[in-house]
Amino acid sequence: STHVVVWATVDKSLGRAAIKSFVVPRDAPGLSVARLEHKLGIKASDTAALLLEDCRIPKDNLLGTAEVNVEKGFAGVMQTFDNTRPLVAGMAIGVARAALEELRSILVDAGVEVSYETPAYNQHAAAAEFLRLEADWEAAHLLALRAAWMADNKEPNSLQASMSKAKAGRSAVDITLKAVELAGTYGYS
């Protein structure tokens, strides 16, 4: 990227209450990448530890007003997280859905029928496990939709946003690992 967004306090005596967002050019003097994280997923977006040492940014790079509102300083940062956590959840939910769809195809090809009419305990063990995974996916999906809906409608959603991100991540890991296990050698295609 050519720019990064940095949250920093504009008044050390006020601490986090004076946090503001700034756009910082990557080539700004004093900005360097201390460490680039090596991730397994979301490679289109780098995650890095940035070091700002005597990095001075013009006032024009400030996002929002220059006025320090002690009541809203840190709350603005948290609102950004509350708005983006459902998006992160959505990425995990998409990965999990793709794994479920591929698993369903593999099970069908193997002659395992998944039925929504028959109780899980009367089905093949792989079909019963698929139904459990699908229920887990549905719970994560609905929680993320709720958190996103609340954000869209300007309702406080800190709890739901945090829960949706946590639930979706755990569900995606559980679903993808179990899909690999149930698919056997096809799970590594």
Model-assigned labels for residue ranges:
Residues 1-33:
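A short core secondary-structure module
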Residues 53-75:
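Long, acidic (Asp/Glu-rich), low-complexity accessory segments flanking structured domains
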Residues 51, 79-189:
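Alpha-helical interface subdomain recognition
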Residues 12-16, 40-44, 69-71:
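Solvent-exposed alpha-helices and their adjacent loops that cap or buttress functional pockets
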Residues 31-33, 40-42, 62-63, 77, ...:
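Short clusters of hydrophobic/aromatic residues that line enzyme substrate/ligand-binding pockets
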Residues 27-56:
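Flexible, small-/acidic-enriched active-site or ligand-binding loops
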Residues 36-40, 66-67, 108:
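Glycine-anchored helix-breaking recognition loops at helix->coil/strand junctions
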